[in-house]
Amino acid sequence: MVNVTVTFTITEFCLHTGVSEEELNEIVGLGVIEPCENETASWLFDDHAAIVVQRALRLRQELALDWPGIAMTLTLLEENDRLRQENRLLIQRLSRFIKHP
């Protein structure tokens, strides 16, 4: 199976997601997304960054949050997901030691 990573220039990313370059600068500055590491001075973004921005835009529209609020919300949602996965793993490990009737 081949993994294909799509990358976007700043202009392509803005057109694809609907954010302005100013908003993109703020989003990157807040750490919501990061440009792909590359050798050139211009930013490139992958498809995961586009998904995160689309999720952020839904939060902005539905909850009327500003970008710092969105950054905090996304961080907390990611932490919640990570803790749920860790909890599932620990429950699986623990179930080996518990006798079921």
Curated annotation (Swiss-Prot):
InterPro entries per the UniProt record, alphabetical: CbpM (IPR022835)
Disulfide bonds, paired cysteine numbers: none
Coiled coil: none
Function: Interacts with CbpA and inhibits both the DnaJ-like co-chaperone activity and the DNA binding activity of CbpA. Together with CbpA, modulates the activity of the DnaK chaperone system. Does not inhibit the co-chaperone activity of DnaJ.
Similarity remark: Belongs to the CbpM family.
NCBIfam families named in the record: PRK10265.1
Name of protein: Chaperone modulatory protein CbpM
Organism (species): Citrobacter koseri (strain ATCC BAA-895 / CDC 4225-83 / SGSC4696)
Highest classification ranks of the organism: Bacteria, Pseudomonadati, Pseudomonadota, Gammaproteobacteria, Enterobacterales
